[in-house]
Amino acid sequence: MKFYKYHALGNDYLVINPQDLKFPLTPEKIKIICHRNFGIGSDGILLGPLASTKAQFALRIFNPDGSEAEKSGNGLRIFSRYLWDMGLVDEKPFSIETAGGIVESAIKDAGKTVQVEMGKVSFWSRDIPVIGDDREVIQEKIFLDEGIFTFCAATIGNPHCVILLDDINSEVARNFGPIFEGYPLFPNRTNVQFMKVLDRSTIQIEIWERGAGYTLASGSSSSAAAATAHKLGLCDSKIIVKMPGGDILIQIKDDFHISMTDSVTKLAQGELSTEIFAIETVINI
């Protein structure tokens, strides 16, 4: 089975064309394929292009734990670059249907850069979702034994919990990310961003991704964090988001529609051996 591997700011995905699929892509097989010791290794799988009646292409996005994601900003940029590499698109904007909605993408600089119109950020509990009264989830508190955390919740097709802190690092994300991901307020679990505002045009985030764990970069996380900083009046509408994997430009329109632009790198392509499925289950290391 053919695969194509790309990364966007260190956030790596395998692209698999459904026409090349030789077996059902079950959650257990996804776990093995994405495992960095027993499989190819990646932050997820992009299955496409699929047929769509609503857009030019459709895409399914899978997390490394086998669950399906509604939307991934870096995944969409990677898939867009794959479509370009396969000669399926040119530099005219094109549409992609995901479980989290339809986005518009455009190839820039002869394939070096991809711009994705991510859609509109909502802070309303009914959209995210967040349990409780219908409200915008802004500056609410979660009480843990380790302290009180103030957060905002948002969705851009998938759920996010943004926590503003004075200091952030990978240890904070690894220690507290799993707690917030599965916190009872979020019935579908949530992605988590620990955010520090550097100035009115720059923020820094550490990311714990639902279904993937600690992540070097995330497009949808960048979008949610930047929108939150703008919503709180801490940043202007054009924001550089700094992550361990690199920086990305987020532009926020008046109605909180998000545009995201950065590069994508092709890493490899090859044939997946079915021998990797000899292991019955993935060992969590």
Curated annotation (Swiss-Prot):
It is found in: Cytoplasm. Keywords: Amino-acid biosynthesis, Cytoplasm, Isomerase, Lysine biosynthesis. Substrate binds at N11, N63, G73, N74, N158, N191, E209, R210, G219, S220. It comes from Nostoc sp. (strain PCC 7120 / SAG 25.82 / UTEX 2576). Its EC number is 5.1.1.7. This is Diaminopimelate epimerase 2. Homodimer. Pathway: Amino-acid biosynthesis; L-lysine biosynthesis via DAP pathway; DL-2,6-diaminopimelate from LL-2,6-diaminopimelate: step 1/1. The record marks H160, E209 as: Could be important to modulate the pK values of the two catalytic cysteine residues. PANTHER family: DIAMINOPIMELATE EPIMERASE, DIAMINOPIMELATE EPIMERASE, CHLOROPLASTIC. GO terms for cellular component: cytosol. One of its GO terms (molecular function) is diaminopimelate epimerase activity. NCBIfam families: DapF. Catalyzes the stereoinversion of LL-2,6-diaminopimelate (L,L-DAP) to meso-diaminopimelate (meso-DAP), a precursor of L-lysine and an essential component of the bacterial peptidoglycan. HAMAP family: DAP_epimerase. Pfam families: DAP_epimerase. InterPro entries: DAP_epimerase_DapF. Belongs to the diaminopimelate epimerase family. GO terms for biological process: lysine biosynthetic process via diaminopimelate. It catalyses: (2S,6S)-2,6-diaminopimelate = meso-2,6-diaminopimelate.
